[in-house]
């Protein structure tokens, strides 16, 4: 039995070591410390991904309008609620408020009277629809750089043949990269390019040796403090983590609610237990034997 255990242990250890070697974990990975609930970080990550990565990489499992709904809709709804409160309490309306009200009625709103009239004609569900439409429009304007529509999957427009000629390989689809490589890997990889004149693009990478991707973030790195640059890379990594599993947003949120429920249930059960045991303690209750 003992021998069997030792053999199993050494086989497992051997496997772990070889998997680690395969995964190239001889490089110390930095902790990404991303937080999928941080919506500002995800928004910045989405913008940076579209600006710096989408020219080469697709994330074909993701559609633009899903990003709109998951990452930007909340802000648009929030702005509308604020504008509506200001409108109903007769506070002065800012340009942002007018924009938010225009979003809600799906028409350009120019004055208070018009805002009140237009809103009065719409049901809540119509307003919801309009706000979602406005979010799609915003995403189409800021994140879609090619002729794609907001309902399309996010596909890079780089021709496959060209990519192979330029890089020796096609840039991989990044839909699931956070799940296959992990966030720490991506975070470290993007910050590990170094100058190497023997390589076609003049750079190499500590995590992915002889990499065929250029250091696309070098300009960003030079124009910012290290702290801000690291935050930008963290945001891109966070965004890729979200792309790998969009349902995580719902799951994490649900997890907190379940824990909250269990906590309340714990208090109630404890009080109930005390109530039952009080009778036992004071001898009012005796088991029938
Ligand atoms: C100019 C084209 C180009 C751009 C722009 C680009 N990449 Fe790449 N990327 C590549 C190529 C080519 C590879 C394959 C590298 C290799 O295997 O040697 C790659 C590989 C990767 C990998 C490794 C994937 C894997 O599974 O091995 C990740 C992660 C990655 N890129 C992320 C990014 C991110 C994030 C951005 C934007 C900040 C970006 N890339 C911008 C061309 C590009």
Residue ranges of model-derived segments:
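Bacterial N-terminal signal peptides that target proteins for export
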Residues: 1-12
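Electrostatic cytochrome c docking/interface patches
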Residues: 24-47, 58-69, 244, 248-253
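Gly/Gly-Pro-rich "capping" loops immediately C-terminal to redox-active cysteine motifs
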Residues: 35-36, 61-182, 187-191, 200-225
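The canonical Cys-X-X-Cys-His
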Residues: 49-60, 236
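Conserved nucleotide-binding/hydrolysis modules and their immediate coupling elements
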Residues: 197
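Extended, hydrophilic extramembrane loops/domains of integral membrane proteins
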Residues: 207, 212-245, 249
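Juxtamembrane interface at the cytosolic side of transmembrane helices
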Residues: 251-255, 262-289
